[in-house]
Every structure is written in C-alpha cells, then in structure tokens.
C-alpha cells in the first residue's frame, strides 16, 4: 500500500502539477498545503469544459480520486506496513466527495524531527478508526442526498443549488460528474445547475451565479418552471386577465355610448367659416358691436363672452372645439336680433346698458395754445386753478384735468434724465399741434 500511495502521488505530480517537489524535510509545512493546492487547482480549472463534453479533465479526475484514498495514503507515507493498512479501507474509487469535510492527513510531526516518526501503533489505530467512522457517515449522507435529489423535480434542484451555495459547492459539481447516466437523466439539469460553474466567480443578474446551461437544457427547464411553478419567496402574483370591454351595441341600443354632440350636429370647418362671415355681416348691418354681442350672450344665456372672443370667432382664430361651442349661441342671438329688428327689444336695451365709452374730445388750436402756455408756467395746477382755467376756456373741468395729466406724461417721455431740453418753449409753442395719440381722453367709467 505504501508503494501504491507513492504511485498515486507521482500520478498527481505528473498530470496536474498539484503537489510540488519538496526536500526530505519539507513535511514540516504541514499537510494543509497539499489539500489547499488541490482545492485551488480544482476550483481554478472548473470554469472550462473539455472538448469531449465531460466537465472534468484528467487532472480533475485524478484529484477526485485522491479525496477517496488520501486519508490512508497520507498515513502510510513513511510508517511502513501499519500505515498501508489504513489506506486499504478508503478505496480510491469512492462514490463521490459530495459534502466531504476537509480532513488533514494523520501525520504527527515531532518538533525538530524528520517528519517520518510517529508516536506509536496505538495512535495509528485510533486515527484509522476515526477515519472509518467519518467515511461511513459521509457515505450515509451521500445516500440521503442522492435520494432527496431523485425525489425532487429538476427545476427545484436547480433553485435549491442557487439559493443555498456553500463552501463545498464545487465538490458537489464534481460528484455530479460521477453520477450514472440513469440518475443524470432523472435529475434533469443537476449537472449544469450548480453555482460553481461560473466565470472567475462572476455572478449573473439578480445576484445568483450564472449557470452554464445548454440551450436545449435551458429551454427545457425554463418553460415548465415559468409555466407551472414559481418557488421564489417573492413571487409575483398571477396576472389577472384584463376586464372585458364595455358592451357596444347598435346606435339605438341602450348600452351603446352616446356622444353629446353626434356627428350630424358637429359642423365642419367650411360651415364654421361660412357662418362666421355671415354673422359679421349681420352684426354690422344691425348696428351692434362685438362687445354688445358678448354682453348680450352673457345676459341672455348665462355665458359671458368678451369682445376679444367675438373678434377671434369672426377671424376664425379660436380652436375648432371652441368654435363649435360658440356657434349655436351666436346663431340664437342672430335669430333673436332678426326677429326684433323693427322694434326696440331686450337686445337693444342690453346694448344700451353696455359699456359706455365717451368719444374722443377734440380741442381747438387756440384753446390748446392757452393750455400749453399755462403748462409752461405751472405743469401741475391745483384743483382751483383747473376750475378757473376750464371756466375761462369754456371746457369741462375733467377735460382740463386729463389734458394736464397727459401733458406731464409726454414731458417725461421727451425729457432726458439730465434735465429739460434746450428750446423747450419753442417746441411746445402754441402754433404746434399735439400729436393725435396724446389728445385729451376721458377715463372709462
């Protein structure tokens, strides 16, 4: 058995380059380095599959074999026949290292020794018994796990592997490679569903390891999983079908939807243009202003419209919707105005009660010169001065007051911030006429 163990070590060294050659005294570093080298080699090479379709290379196969007989082989390294007996019980063709704990070799190194001296045959027997008990427990656990995996559906095995990854997940992947073909077929995606098959430890979307599913396996697993089962704890509720559309019947059916304005009542753009043209002509012929029409509509029908709205309606500047709303009201107003064109009616009374705006006051040239001369003397006269000036010029007091207000505003616009312009007296002489846009106007009452 010692020879077999040494051959086993030579195979590992030649095929996978896992164990480095050490001098005779190199055993003092402990057996943990040997185990760690194996683990690092297997974990690093798991990301690449062989060309023949098998997930394990030759080095991985030999490494998996080393887990089965490493307990006895390590003990028989330098102890002779006693250590060889320990290696015979742990067969190198073990079923699988699934869930196998990290067991260090049973070599006890003395301080300052060569590393091949043991404490005695009693310690070897005790260690051998412990190893046998541990192997029996591992075999029982493996059988239970295999039975549970056979009973589970494939998609549940896939989710269990992704939701509970552990430190020995890469070993479970190696165990899946040793499964017989019948078990691999019954378990579906067990081989490729382990979380250890990742690229340099990268995780897929959602924080779960990205499995290397084949396209056929992925489709076969995803379809029944999404169609029938959803074992995630935060599963989405089943989407309810959309509510049925409201019943639609013929136009006369009570369940049908009726538009307040049917297609027959909705005017076209040509109709609106023709009506606006006729309305404007009739309004001017009857002698009503746009403001009178807006006020009459507010008094008669409760909808107050401004002069601007009526103007925009006649110019076709409103939206189509607003034009359609305003057309029937204006049509009723036209009918009312045409029927009462010969006698004073409520429309005339409403128009007479509308906003009264005083006409523009025109001042004679001589009167304007007198106001200009008084303005140069006193730009802001008092109320008594305005009254006396209005009496002397035979003007209304309000007209004189408004003229002085407009004149002061004109002076502000024409005078720069530095002071008065030179020759202002000549500019504002009596022979000059005030521009028409600065004439006397009375305020709106």
Curated annotation (Swiss-Prot):
Annotated disulfide bonds: none
Sequence intervals crossing the membrane: none
Basic residues: compositionally biased ranges: 227-237
Compositionally biased tracts (Low complexity): 125-151
Coiled coil regions, renumbered to chain: none
Domain POU-specific, chain residue ranges per copy: 264-338
GO biological process entries: cerebral cortex radially oriented cell migration; epidermis development; forebrain astrocyte development; forebrain ventricular zone progenitor cell division; hypothalamus cell differentiation; myelination in peripheral nervous system; negative regulation of gene expression; nervous system development
Residue spans of biased composition, Pro residues class: 239-253
Molecular function terms, GO-annotated: DNA binding; DNA-binding transcription activator activity, RNA polymerase II-specific; DNA-binding transcription factor activity; DNA-binding transcription factor activity, RNA polymerase II-specific; HMG box domain binding; identical protein binding; RNA polymerase II cis-regulatory region sequence-specific DNA binding; sequence-specific DNA binding
Biased composition (Gly residues): 68-90
GO cellular component: nucleus; transcription regulator complex
Tissue: Expressed specifically at high levels in the brain.
Swiss-Prot/TrEMBL keywords: Activator, Differentiation, DNA-binding, Homeobox, Neurogenesis, Nucleus, Phosphoprotein, Transcription, Transcription regulation
Localization, UniProt: Nucleus
Region of interest: Disordered: 63-173, 203-269, 336-361, 411-445
Basic and acidic residues: bias regions: 217-226
Primary gene name: Pou3f2
Protein name, per record: POU domain, class 3, transcription factor 2
Annotated family: Belongs to the POU transcription factor family. Class-3 subfamily.
Quaternary structure and partners: Interacts with PQBP1. Interaction with ISL1.
DNA-binding region: 356-415
């Amino acid at each position: 058995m010692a020879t077999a163990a040494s051959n086993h070590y030579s195979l590992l060294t030649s095929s996978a380059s896992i164990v480095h050659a050490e001098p005779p005294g190199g055993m003092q570093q402990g057996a943990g380095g040997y185990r760690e080298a194996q683990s690092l080699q297997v974990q690093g090479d798991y990301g690449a599959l062989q060309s023949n379709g098998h997930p394990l290379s030759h080095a991985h196969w030999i490494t998996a074999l080393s887990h089965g007989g490493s307990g006895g082989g390590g003990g028989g390294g330098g102890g002779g026949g006693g250590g060889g007996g320990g290696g015979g019980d742990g067969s190198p063709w073990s079923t699988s290292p699934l869930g196998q704990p990290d067991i260090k070799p049973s070599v006890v190194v003395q301080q300052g020794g060569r590393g091949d001296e043991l404490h005695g045959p009693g310690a070897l027997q005790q260690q051998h018994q412990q190893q046998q008990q541990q192997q029996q427990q591992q075999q029982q656990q493996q059988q239970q796990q295999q039975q549970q995996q056979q009973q589970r559906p494939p998609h549940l095995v896939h989710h269990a592997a992704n939701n509970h990854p552990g430190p020995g997940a890469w070993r479970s992947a190696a165990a899946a490679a040793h499964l017989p073909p019948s078990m691999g077929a019954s378990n579906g995606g067990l081989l490729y569903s382990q979380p250890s098959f990742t690229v340099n430890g990268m995780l897929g979307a959602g924080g779960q390891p990205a499995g290397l599913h084949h396209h056929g396996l992925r489709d076969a697993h995803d379809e029944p999983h999404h169609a029938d089962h959803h074992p995630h704890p935060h599963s989405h509720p089943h989407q309810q079908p959309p509510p049925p559309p409201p019943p639609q019947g013929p136009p006369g059916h009570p369940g049908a939807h009726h538009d307040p304005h049917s297609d027959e009542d909705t005017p076209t753009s040509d109709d609106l243009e023709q009506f606006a043209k006729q309305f404007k002509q009739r309004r001017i012929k009857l002698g009503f202003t746009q403001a009178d029409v807006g006020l009459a509509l507010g008094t008669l029908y409760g909808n107050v419209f401004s002069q601007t709205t009526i103007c925009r309606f006649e110019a076709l500047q409103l939206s189509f919707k607003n034009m359609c709303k305003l057309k029937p009201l204006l049509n009723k107003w036209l009918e009312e105005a045409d029927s009462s064109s010969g006698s004073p009616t409520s429309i005339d009374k409403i128009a007479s009660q509308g906003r009264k705006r005083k006409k523009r006051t025109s001042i004679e040239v001589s009167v304007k010169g007198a106001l200009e001369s008084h303005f140069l003397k006193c730009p802001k006269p008092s109320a008594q001065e305005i009254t006396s000036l209005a009496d002397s010029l035979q003007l209304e007091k309000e007209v004189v007051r408004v003229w002085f207000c407009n004149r002061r505003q004109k002076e502000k616009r024409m005078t720069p911030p530095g002071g008065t312009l030179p020759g202002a007296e000549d500019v504002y002489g009596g022979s000059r006429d005030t521009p028409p846009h600065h004439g006397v106007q009375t305020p709106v009452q």
